[in-house]
Amino acid sequence: MPVINLEIKSRMPYAGGQSFGEVGAYEQVDGMVHFGVDPDSLANETISDIRLAPKDGQGKVGFSSDFRVLVPVDQSKGNRRLFLDILNRGKYSAAKDMNSSATFVPDAPPDPGNGFLMRQGYSVAWCGWQHDVPEISGIMGIRVPDAATTQGPISGKVVVTFQFNTPTASQLLSDRNHRSYPADDLDDPNAIMTVQEHEDAPEEIIPRDQWSFARVEEETVVPDSQYAYLASGFQPGKVYQVIYTTTGAPVSGLGLLAIRDFGSFLRYGSTDEGNPCAGNIDHSYVSGVS
């Protein structure tokens, strides 16, 4: 089985031991699930660059994901169904809507809301699958290896586009504080920044000496490979683009295997393998919202 170890870090009463109708109380299980997958399996062949990922002594590609599972304390009262909620940027999505729960709060247990899923007896699970989510406690992600060739790590060009609503001096080279691809060389003369008046307007190249890889911190410009800084400031409405070289190619498609294989493990894995749902799932439902 692709799940090689379920590392449980905590078990606690869910929602302070709240009882959900005839099903009763739930338990919350948190931890890390470790995978080892065969890169040559037909079931995995559509994952881009999986054969370029490093392998262990058994020829498997390893990676790991954060997970959380909610199960009835008395699983005989459950409905023998699993609801696997696909995280959106590491945050709960579908289950929140199903339960009419409060807005996601990092590092806080999922709000039970009206308890719909629990009152129906569902086991509910989440598994990190995006490698670039912010490293914030409570946001679930996945740790994947970088692809590499016989010549070593993979380098290539990255294009980052951004547009602002307010004047800004520096910008992280990613969206919504996700992990960025850092520039290889802060002084790379071949790095390019362009600006457009709007999306369909012609691009104008901004002279290299007018911008840099840096961030503004307490009114001081600090060199930083993960930020772009423009001396004159980024203007609202205009479209900016940075093209630069980076090294490191995470095999991000492994996140899709994490969802597939964690869901399968919860349905078919045994008690001896550490499965908190062992023997209590007949049907699985997978849903996500973006």
State what each model feature region is.
Residues 1-289:
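C-terminal His-loop and adjacent cap/lid subdomain of alpha/beta-hydrolase
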